[in-house]
Amino acid sequence: MLGIQYPVIQGGMAWVADASLAAAVSNAGGLGLISSINAGTEAVHNEIRKCRQLTDKPFGVNIMLQAPNAGEIAQMVFEEGVRILTTGAGSPAQYMAMWKEAGIKVIPVVASVALALKMQDAGADAVVAEGAESGGHVGELHTMPLVPQVVDALDIPVIAAGGICDGRGAATVQRDPFQLQQRFVGKQVHTDHTDHKQRDHRNGDRTQQLSGLCHFSLKPFARHCHLSFPF
């Protein structure tokens, strides 16, 4: 469905998942994703064009549907001919007909069986079942209990994410393909600050924290998972 050599998807991460990282992952045989989070529409457009200069392999764009310019980005990726989209923080239903007309593969990120079923009914081609071990805004279920329940409930492919950092993690949840995010933060190909890359590389198993509650339209409150910093 995705046209990739290896079952590895690089998740969309704000400030990290740029054209350079997406192209590097795609050139290596996985699926690279450009993040549109906290980015202007033209900036995302430029990253798409840059990625096409860096790779002739499949790549996609991640859209945060709660963003003020989500509608503009939804229209832009349609016009630009992006082939693969992942979505989060909202329902892509209002854009689905337009994207389907263009043959775009739409893969929402979900944190529950109920949301996964809604996305399937809306016409999603697959879903990313992302457990609470993931970074960023997370749900309540952890990856191990979440993924099997979503697999059993859906008729479309399910991609596992959350706490997976290598093939052993993917084998544990028995998912092919699987999505990685934080694993790519320390790589030199993207433009994130060097201090962040180095700190991520040094982190152990007790440096990730859950804090705060954020309001989303499809979920009243969502926790946020992040690295601990000395300030």
Where do the language-model regions lie?
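Active-site entrance/lid segments in N-terminal catalytic domains of soluble metabolic enzymes
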Residues: 1-157
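Residue-level detector of alpha-helix initiation sites
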Residues: 16, 164-165
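Conserved active-site-proximal phosphate/metal-binding subdomains
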Residues: 145-155, 159, 165-231
